[in-house]
Structure formats: structure tokens, C-alpha cells
Swiss-Prot record:
<dbReference type="Pfam" id="PF03684">
    <property type="entry name" value="UPF0179"/>
</dbReference>
<comment type="similarity">
    <text>Belongs to the UPF0179 family.</text>
</comment>
<protein>
    <recommendedName>
        <fullName>UPF0179 protein Mhun_1135</fullName>
    </recommendedName>
</protein>
<dbReference type="InterPro" id="IPR005369">
    <property type="entry name" value="UPF0179"/>
</dbReference>
Length: 157
């Protein structure tokens, strides 16, 4: 079984359940005077995380009604649609969202929340399913991606 790299952070108590996913959106204004804010804000903005374990520590928090809890999180895989040219398992890609409008029925799948444009991801699975219509290019393919782990060699052309 693959061991996910985890980080200790603090989340609102309503999110402190294994399997809960969230997208870290950054620091709130109320965090400026908090003495433990550094632990809450050790994640990368815009990335999707999954709670994998709960720790015993709980904290009062001006942002989260009901307080906050210390947890272990790992970056969560995200399903998205990509060009069929790059939809290959175990391929590293630099995400570039297609230029289309929000009226497109596959816009959310091609521009998923939790994926940061310009960052490197690994396609872990090419998922079966119906082809999605696309007005700006070839029908995008549904894949599962994870961020390129830190410490792996990064090729930069």
C-alpha cells in the first residue's frame, strides 16, 4: 500500500473527519492575531487536501465556529479533463487550462478547483467514460492527477 506524504495542520472541527477533502484558500484576516496561525497556514493555496488522521489537540478559533482540530492531511488526487494528446498514465504534465467559456458543459471538469495552473502534476489514471464535447479542440479525456511530489527531479526545458 502506497504511503501518502502527510502534513500536520489545523482545520475547522466540522472538517476534522478522515476522508474529508477541502481546497486550502489561504489566510483569513482574523488569523493575523492568532498565535498558532503558522500551523494552520502551512499548506499551498489552491491545492486540494484530504484529512487522513485526527490528532487529540483542539483549539479555539475566530474563523471556525465550534473551534479547530489538529489533523494530518495529504494532497488529494483530482479528476480533470485534459487533451487526449497528453492523457497517458504516469505522465508528468504542466497544467494549462483550455481557453473556453464557463457556459461549456465540461468547463468545471477542465478547470477543476484544487488544481493550480502552471504547476506540475502526474497523471495517475486515465479514466473510462464518454467523450466530452469540446468547442475549442479535441474532446478532452478524464484523468486523475496528483501534484508532483517534492524531491522528485523536475525537468525544465
Amino acid at each position: 500500500m502506497e504511503q501518502k506524504k502527510t502534513r500536520v495542520t489545523i482545520v475547522g472541527s466540522v472538517y476534522a473527519q478522515p476522508g474529508t477533502q477541502f481546497v486550502y484558500m489561504g489566510r483569513a484576516d482574523q488569523c493575523e492575531s492568532c498565535t498558532i496561525a503558522r500551523v494552520c497556514h502551512n499548506l499551498e493555496s489552491g491545492r486540494r487536501y484530504e484529512v487522513v488522521a485526527i490528532r487529540a489537540a483542539s483549539h479555539r478559533c475566530p474563523v471556525h465556529h465550534g473551534g479547530a482540530v489538529t489533523v494530518d492531511v495529504a494532497e488529494a488526487p483530482v479528476e480533470m479533463r485534459v487533451s487526449p494528446d497528453i492523457a497517458r498514465k504516469n505522465t508528468t504534465i504542466v497544467v494549462k487550462f483550455p481557453e473556453c467559456d464557463e457556459a461549456c458543459e465540461t468547463f468545471a471538469a477542465c478547470h477543476p478547483i484544487g488544481v493550480v495552473e502552471g504547476q506540475k502534476y502526474i497523471i495517475t489514471d486515465v479514466l473510462e467514460g464518454e467523450a466530452a464535447p469540446c468547442r475549442t479542440g479535441p474532446s478532452p479525456v478524464l484523468v486523475r492527477v496528483v501534484p508532483l511530489p517534492e524531491g522528485l527531479p523536475r525537468y525544465t526545458p
